[in-house]
């Protein structure tokens, strides 16, 4: 999927849904140089790019903005359960004006589950805001949720988020290095 425009979308702009089978059959998919804006206009909990149960995919050089939920979400098994997602690359994306105070428990970039050798690098993420009335949590810039492990998060610029600019719910053996995280609402 290259150089496409997605605008005024009712749900997810791009949904790549693999099966949880070994070996994984959803692999080697590139989403690059796309412009994704104003998604989730009917189903507010929609995502700009949603990638589940996939291997060796590149989500790079995309501009994603003005969604009510997460910009990019990758993974899809809760906790440390066996999982096929690995070696995915989320790099050099420009993600902004996400959440806009509509929902909570989301991020500019969101991951879920064990994902060995997945890389989140060189992204610029800002203006991520959650619904303050929903206990005021979950407007995170980069959000590694339950079990997100064995990943590299490096060289990202993340700022102006209603919660933290980086949040690890629980996980292990992640490498977080050389990022700039600034102006999170909770620290």
Predicted regions and their residues:
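Right-handed parallel beta-helix
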Residues: 1-11, 25-40, 55-69, 84-99, ...
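Extracellular beta-strand/beta-solenoid scaffold signature
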Residues: 9-22, 42-51, 68-80, 103-112, ...
